[in-house]
Amino acid sequence: IRLGSDMGKLPAPFIDTATGDPTVLPMVFPSAPSAAMKTAAALTASWAGRLAYWRGADFPVYFNEAPAGEHFVVFVTNTARPTFLKDFPKVEGPQISVGDAPNSLAEKMLIVAGRDDADLIAAMKALGRGSSVMIGDTFKPAAQQEPERRKAYDAPRWLDTDQKVPFSRLIEY
């Protein structure tokens, strides 16, 4: 049974937090990805890794081809796209969509799209912040202000070992 394409279900089906298995999330690029496209992929890996947490994550890379039998992320601009998305409509800004993977009966693809490379980065930053409500098959983030830079050693899961750390801070239910 093919699932509907709904951004509201994210991170499913791309990340399964109900099992103890590591996340495997292939990244698909056009034949020659730009440095900014790779930055968007790094932001995607950071988002997925944060959600996979202790389960671990692996990000196999594909160029110009869709992986068989797996959900995956694909990066698309109006001028650079894998051939299997040659008919994907041009976009007018940062956009993330969920669609049916080609040649598959059940898998989905997360399409990170933009007019240019900067839009890809903007789309993934918006998704990574997780502050927007996403409904339907497409999310078009509005322009967002960059958050203030974090202080050194201020990461969300950082434990300050200069003081006592209660065991309860190490457990997540």
Predicted region positions:
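Solvent-exposed alpha-helical segments and adjacent loops
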Residues: 1-173
